[in-house]
């Protein structure tokens, strides 16, 4: 008799996705981050659901409700810090996952890649709105500054901002709608993840060499299920260390002060995972130009399939582009550092140079390096 997992309509889908899925035999630990992101999403949805049971989205009580969760709810402090630091883990895994895709040429799976970029935007939007909910100083002013950027859109900008605010400033209406969107978006993200996997399983996984691996496939279970479990254990150990020993390490002390529209914090800055984009935004003196650069800093990922000039897919055998890739990584770390610094000399010029080099490496130097490497390898 055929196994039920191969015949049952529901189990069959799970079987083809996680059990009998043919996977390349040589995928490294860099391929673990997809499953880790799935675990992160589950952690965020579960902890978020329990937080939503006790949270009130009203300007008068939002801050106190978060305090109440931490003080009075059973293990409320754990749920709250798991959710806050879980977001950081989510972004660490996201950046590594995208970086892996860039290094090994996974962007040639265009549907999978583009849905991945849309997912990145959706997760960033969700995280931004989640940061507003505790209604601390940085929540309020972060929301004010970032939503205000839309006023740079010609003609409709101011109207659009007031429409998003639901009034003439960030207030109760804004907080309520941000809570509503923050609640619904993770479920939209889950649906997008399923589509992301659907397109991935149409082509099969890439591998470190970038070569076709159809002739050398192994079943996902038990090989990669065990490998993924190891990754999950390591990630949870790291997350729990963060939550139980350094819960406020990545947060801003200003957010422990209730929101006050009459008092602006000295340095308004987002969470660490947005700092690179914030640095790019600030490096352009023009408001509309800054907003466009901010959007393009992520949108540029969608151009990667068209900027690929080499006949080799992966960077495994391409030392020149490899060097450029690691310069790009260092450059992003510099941008992250600059995003957290005040707008003064020498940080302004460093930020501008780092922003120019970010776009130059991706749009100019990497495609040229691909052509040079092809000529050196005498492919013609």
Swiss-Prot record:
Q: Give the location in the cell.
A: Mitochondrion inner membrane
Which residues participate in heme b b566 binding? 97, 196
Keywords of the record, alphabetical order, are: Electron transport, Heme, Iron, Membrane, Metal-binding, Mitochondrion, Mitochondrion inner membrane, Respiratory chain, Transmembrane, Transmembrane helix, Transport, Ubiquinone
Cysteines joined through disulfide linkages = none
The note on the cofactor says: Binds 2 heme b groups non-covalently.
Q: Which domain of life is it from?
A: Eukaryota
- Tell me, in one coarse class, where this protein mainly resides: mitochondrion
> Would you tell me the Gene Ontology cellular component terms?
mitochondrial inner membrane; respiratory chain complex III
Question: What is one GO biological process annotated to this record?
Answer: mitochondrial electron transport, ubiquinol to cytochrome c
TM ranges? 33-53, 77-98, 113-133, 178-198, 226-246, 288-308, 320-340, 347-367
- Stored InterPro entries: Cyt_b/b6_C, Cyt_b/b6_C_sf, Cyt_b/b6_N, Cytb/b6-like_sf, Cytochrome_b, Cytochrome_b_C_euk/bac, Cytochrome_b_N_euk/bac, Di-haem_cyt_TM
Record-listed a ubiquinone binding positions = 201
What is a single molecular function from GO for this protein?
A: ubiquinol-cytochrome-c reductase activity
Identify which cofactors the protein needs according to its UniProt entry. Answer: heme b
What's in the misc comment field?
Heme 1 (or BL or b562) is low-potential and absorbs at about 562 nm, and heme 2 (or BH or b566) is high-potential and absorbs at about 566 nm.
Q: How does the annotation summarize its subunit structure?
A: The cytochrome bc1 complex contains 11 subunits: 3 respiratory subunits (MT-CYB, CYC1 and UQCRFS1), 2 core proteins (UQCRC1 and UQCRC2) and 6 low-molecular weight proteins (UQCRH/QCR6, UQCRB/QCR7, UQCRQ/QCR8, UQCR10/QCR9, UQCR11/QCR10 and a cleavage product of UQCRFS1). This cytochrome bc1 complex then forms a dimer.
| Similarity comment | Belongs to the cytochrome b family.
UniProt function note: Component of the ubiquinol-cytochrome c reductase complex (complex III or cytochrome b-c1 complex) that is part of the mitochondrial respiratory chain. The b-c1 complex mediates electron transfer from ubiquinol to cytochrome c. Contributes to the generation of a proton gradient across the mitochondrial membrane that is then used for ATP synthesis.
Q: What is this protein called?
A: Cytochrome b
What lineage is this protein's organism placed in? Eukaryota, Metazoa, Chordata, Craniata, Vertebrata
């Amino acid at each position: 008799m055929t196994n039920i997992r191969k015949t049952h309509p529901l189990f069959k889908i799970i079987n083809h996705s996680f059990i009998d899925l043919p996977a390349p035999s040589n995928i490294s630990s860099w391929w673990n981050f997809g499953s880790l992101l799935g675990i992160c999403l589950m952690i965020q949805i579960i902890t978020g659901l329990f937080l939503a049971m006790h949270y009130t989205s009203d300007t008068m009580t939002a801050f106190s409700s978060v305090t109440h969760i931490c003080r009075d709810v059973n293990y409320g402090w754990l749920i709250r810090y798991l959710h806050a630091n879980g977001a950081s883990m989510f972004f660490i895994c996201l950046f590594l996952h995208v970086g892996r895709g860039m290094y090994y040429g996974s962007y040639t799976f265009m549907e999978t890649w583009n849905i991945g970029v849309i997912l990145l935007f959706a997760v960033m939007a969700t995280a931004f709105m989640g940061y507003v909910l505790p209604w601390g100083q940085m929540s309020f002013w972060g929301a004010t500054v970032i939503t205000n950027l839309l006023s740079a859109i010609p003609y409709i900008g101011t109207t659009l901002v007031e429409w998003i605010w639901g009034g003439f400033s960030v207030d109760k209406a804004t907080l309520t709608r941000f809570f509503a969107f923050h609640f619904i978006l993770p479920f939209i993200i889950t649906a997008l993840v399923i589509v992301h996997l659907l397109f991935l399983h149409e082509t099969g996984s890439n591998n470190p060499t970038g070569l076709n691996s159809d002739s050398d496939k192994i079943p996902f279970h038990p090989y990669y299920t065990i490998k993924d479990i190891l990754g999950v254990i390591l990630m949870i150990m790291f997350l729990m260390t963060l939550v139980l020993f350094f819960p406020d390490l990545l947060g801003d002390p200003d957010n422990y002060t209730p929101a006050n529209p009459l008092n602006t914090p000295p340095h308004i800055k987002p969470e660490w995972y947005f700092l690179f984009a914030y640095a790019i935004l600030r490096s352009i003196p023009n408001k509309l130009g800054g907003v466009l650069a901010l959007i393009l800093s992520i949108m540029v990922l969608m151009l990667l399939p068209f900027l690929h000039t080499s006949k080799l897919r992966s960077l495994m055998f391409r030392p020149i582009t490899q060097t450029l890739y690691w310069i790009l990584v260092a450059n992003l770390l510099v941008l992250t550092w600059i995003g957290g610094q005040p707008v003064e000399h020498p940080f302004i010029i460093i930020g501008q140079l780092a922003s120019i080099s970010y776009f130059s490496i991706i749009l100019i130097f990497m495609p040229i390096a691909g052509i040079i490497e092809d000529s050196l390898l005498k492919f013609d």
